[in-house]
Regions:
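Positively charged n-region of N-terminal signal peptides that target proteins for export
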Residues: 1-4
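Lipid interaction determinants
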Residues: 18-121
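General helical structural elements
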Residues: 6-8, 68
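Bacterial N-terminal signal peptides
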Residues: 8-17
């Protein structure tokens, strides 16, 4: 009887842990920082395929430059959040995001359930 209770309890704990785990492919905030917030440039593209050169410094600042004639240059600040990161572009309010793997060397930047940008290296 005790063995059944122990096994049932262990199964319940494992199931609960599986439900609380982040979805496969989602980057933890520290992994976002290690991959992207290093001061090295990477490419971001919008769902409409407007591309930018992005640079996030380890100190919490960021810049973007359009890679074509569309889009605008800007600067701002970033900080890690509980499940991703938040950014504030000059003249705009803060927005928070999660980052999810989306292929080889490609990541989706997500608000709620929608990708608002794709990052590549």
């Amino acid at each position: 009887m005790r063995a059944r209770i122990v096994v049932a309890s262990a199964g319940l704990l494992m199931a609960t842990g599986a439900l609380l785990a982040a979805p496969a492919g989602r980057l933890a905030p520290k992994d976002i920082q290690a991959l992207f917030f290093t001061g090295q440039p990477f490419t971001a593209s919008t769902p409409a395929n407007v591309k930018f050169k992005m640079v996030f410094s380890p100190e919490g600042t960021m810049t973007r430059e359009p890679l074509a004639k569309t889009g605008s240059k800007s600067e701002g600040t970033w900080k890690l959040s509980q499940d991703g990161f938040c950014s504030t572009w000059k003249g705009s309010k803060q927005n928070c995001y999660r980052v999810q793997a989306s292929g080889e060397n490609k990541w989706a930047v997500i608000v709620s359930t929608q990708a608002v940008a794709y990052w590549s290296k």
